[in-house]
Regions:
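C-terminal helix of von Willebrand factor
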Residues: 266-306
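VWA/integrin I-like adhesion module and closely mimicked acidic/polar interface patches used
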Residues: 235-275
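Extracytoplasmic/secreted cell-surface and envelope-processing proteins
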Residues: 66-73, 112-116, 237-243, 262-267, ...
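Bacterial signal peptide processing site
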Residues: 25-28
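C-terminal motif of bacterial Sec signal peptides marking the signal peptidase cleavage site
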Residues: 20-23
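Bacterial N-terminal signal peptides that target proteins for export
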Residues: 1-13
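Von Willebrand factor
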Residues: 51-224, 228-230
């Protein structure tokens, strides 16, 4: 009889161990061959953007001489106002982000005079760093199968905490994105108001293109990151300023580009492409008057990314 009891006890123990092993197996095997691991990892918050800030510069020609290089048919004083309206319309179409900057200056006979900067460098305010809650701690894997049931309960608890944590983090991040969008919109409104309030006076003395480029180069040097510059001009330099600014790795767009003589326009374009490349510009695009639109300027400034 004792032998029968021992046999029944052995069978019962075997069944219990088999049941325990089966219970563990149903949760998977993420924690190794012993017991299952968590089935839901908390989403890792996106790292702060590492994209460089962008500084956008706009140089607008307000000079008009009426000489052989710039004939009376040149559309000035329409050019400054057209340029101002174009820039104001393009700003909300750019991918502006906190940390990006904008400035604008006149091209005149004395372009490198600081008084020609009618829109001082302004930066989109940076947002404060997100204070995210700590992620829940992953349960410690069990040492053996005897701890499997307890571990399985810890896994279930962890998964619930991770789900809640992920939702909380997602909500905080969305609020931050919404706040940044409002900050950018407010910034754009202010810059647009300043652009539309600008009143360019016609300068009959001459045109100093290189002086304007020197202003832009100085601003770019003080603001690390990507640099994008738009000049609204026919690029007829009549002053011959000896300054040679550093436009290293800047993207340059020449807009509202027009000369009465098509041949002169083509020759000048090639000369300026070479000159700007010598100054370090990475790329130069020429947009004739008819092709200079709000959308085209925005597209060119977004070209090549941040």
């Amino acid at each position: 009889m004792a032998r029968g009891r021992r046999a029944r006890s052995s069978i019962a123990l075997s069944l219990a161990l088999a049941f325990l092993a089966g219970g563990c197996a149903q949760f998977g095997s993420d924690a190794g061959a012993t017991c299952p691991g968590p089935t839901l990892d908390p989403a890792v918050p996106p790292a702060a953007s590492t994209a460089a800030s962008v500084t956008y510069g706009f140089l607008i020609d307000r000079a008009y001489t009426g000489d052989a290089k710039r004939s009376p048919s040149y559309p000035c004083p329409q050019l400054p106002r057209t340029a101002l309206d174009t820039v104001a319309g393009a700003l909300p179409k750019l991918d502006l982000r906190p940390g990006d900057s904008v400035f604008a200056a006149w091209i005149s006979h004395n372009s490198n005079d600081i008084r020609e900067i009618f829109l001082p460098v302004a930066q989109v305010p940076r947002s404060t760093a997100l204070d995210l809650p700590a992620a829940p701690a992953r349960p410690k894997p069990p040492v053996n199968k005897l701890e499997c049931n307890q571990y399985a309960e810890q896994v279930r608890s962890y998964n619930e905490q991770a789900k809640t944590w992920r939702a909380t983090v997602g909500d905080l991040q969305q609020r931050a994105r919404d706040a940044d969008a409002k900050t950018v919109a407010t910034f754009v409104d202010r810059q647009q108001a300043a652009l539309r309030a600008a009143a360019p006076a016609q300068d009959p003395v001459g045109t100093d293109i290189y002086g304007g480029l020197a202003v832009a180069g100085g601003v770019f040097k003080s603001n690390p990151g990507r640099h994008k510059l738009v000049l609204f001009s026919d690029m007829s330099d009549t002053i011959g300023n000896a300054v040679r600014p550093d436009l290293a790795q800047s993207d340059v767009v020449i807009a509202l580009y027009h000369r009465d003589d098509p041949n002169d326009q083509g020759v000048a374009q090639k000369q300026w492409e070479t000159a700007l490349r010598t100054l370090g510009a990475r790329a130069t695009v020429f947009l004739p008057w008819a092709a200079t639109t709000v959308d085209k300027i925005a597209d060119q400034l977004k070209e090549g990314g941040r």
